[in-house]
Amino acid sequence: MFNWVKTAMLMAAITALFIVIGGMIGGSRGMTIALLFALGMNFFSYWFSDKMVLRMYNAQEVDENTAPQFYRMVRELATRANLPMPRVYLINEDAPNAFATGRNPEHAAVAATTGILRVLSEREMRGVMAHELAHVKHRDILISTITATMAGAISAIANFAMFFGGRDENGRPANPIAGIAVALLAPIAGALIQMAISRAREFEADRGGAQISGDPQSLATALDKIHRYAAGIPFQAAEQHPATAQMMIMNPLHGGGLQNLFSTHPATEERIARLMEMARTGRFD
């Protein structure tokens, strides 16, 4: 129930941001258009955003015949977590990473890159997929997928405002400063919304994943490996769709500046330290 409240609050916040942007670009008419656009995006995000994200990454669905070891691993972990079997996808990318998406546990999907399967041991891979299934169990996946879709739309509108400006109620060109302000501030606002919901979720998914797998140390060593390997391997699809970065187990973006300042993931060192403490004490609270 609480996650439905968070989802509703997220949709309301992003709708309000759309309306503000619309008003800055086109006055009251722009606000009306932005409201209608936001309502349409909310509907689309709920029903179709997971399919869009998987398509962005050219993810290929696999089964017990095409990826038997990986598929059986996910099935065993889903059983341990008392979850329905999610759809399982592979992404042909060297960069090691993984994510979960969908609107609820009954309509969930997990995806991993071919790179992460090469880099991690079987135990470490179990830790990673348990982390992703924890996102499913906690019903984080709808929030993260909607946020990725809407943040991408906000960036597109900001770019439109920067290059084409807008019109006021009388059809005259809007203040160009407003367009520049929208282009600069809208992506920051979108990033702040992502930050507000992403960092705490990752700690909770680490804890939940450690409970599902029963092996917090393997998730800790997996995070360390992913962090080290990913630093030297660009993730092209993620760079092209930066709004989806917060869905990943590890931030896949390599840019500096705002991308580091507004990182949607907590520090890897802190995540590892918390997991190693769980391994030492045997406590997951």
Swiss-Prot record:
Topology in the lipid bilayer is annotated as:
Multi-pass membrane protein
Q: Where in the cell is it found?
A: Cell inner membrane
Q: How is the cofactor bound?
A: Binds 1 zinc ion per subunit.
MF terms (GO), sorted A to Z: metalloendopeptidase activity; zinc ion binding
Where Zn(2+) binds, per the record, is at 131, 135, 202
Kindly state which keywords UniProt assigns to this record, in alphabetical order.
Answer: Cell inner membrane, Cell membrane, Hydrolase, Membrane, Metal-binding, Metalloprotease, Protease, Transmembrane, Transmembrane helix, Zinc
Domain of life (superkingdom) = Bacteria
- Say if the entry is tagged with keyword Transmembrane helix: yes
Annotated active site: 132
Provide the transmembrane region boundaries.
7-27, 30-50, 146-166, 177-197
Q: Which GO terms are recorded in the biological process aspect for this UniProt protein?
A: proteolysis
Give the cofactors, semicolon-separated: Zn(2+)
Which InterPro entries does UniProt cross-reference here? HtpX_protease (IPR050083), Pept_M48_protease_HtpX (IPR022919), Peptidase_M48 (IPR001915)
The record's EC number reads 3.4.24.-
Q: Choose one Gene Ontology CC annotation of this protein and give it.
A: plasma membrane
Which PANTHER family does this UniProt record tie to the protein? PROTEASE HTPX (PTHR43221:SF1)
Q: Which family does it belong to?
A: Belongs to the peptidase M48B family.
Q: Which NCBIfam families match?
A: PRK01345.1, PRK03001.1
Q: Which HAMAP family match?
A: Pept_M48_protease_HtpX (MF_00188)
The protein's name in its UniProt record:
Protease HtpX homolog
